Amino acid sequence: MRYLKYKRYIMDSIDSRDLLDLVKYPIITDKTTKLLEENQYCFAVDPNATKINIKAAIQYIFNVQVTGVNTCHPPKKKRSIGRFIGKRPHYKKAIITLASKDSINLFPET
């Protein structure tokens, strides 16, 4: 992988370790659980990742067919611990739309 001027990734050769590092964790809220009915999944990803890289990472990790990727940068939230005020770390949110035949099991039953 090489970096451009604006720290965007360009995948010359897809390295599996780089793809695994792009996707951090699934975001599970009331809104995202409603999106599961429409076969859309929400993940927190690396802020410098592009839609093409996110699509390649999801297809590699979960072995599914991705039909669409929407991304946004949510605003930082203030956080206070005692008298110290700070902000939560910056992240990028990606909403992934899968093909109708595919699904990701976010809640495994044990």
UniProtKB/Swiss-Prot annotation:
PANTHER family: 60S RIBOSOMAL PROTEIN L23A. Keywords: Chloroplast, Plastid, Ribonucleoprotein, Ribosomal protein, RNA-binding, rRNA-binding. GO terms for molecular function: rRNA binding; structural constituent of ribosome. Pfam families: Ribosomal_L23. One of its GO terms (biological process) is translation. This is Large ribosomal subunit protein uL23c. The keyword rRNA-binding applies. It comes from Porphyra purpurea (Red seaweed). Part of the 50S ribosomal subunit. Disulfide bonds: none annotated.
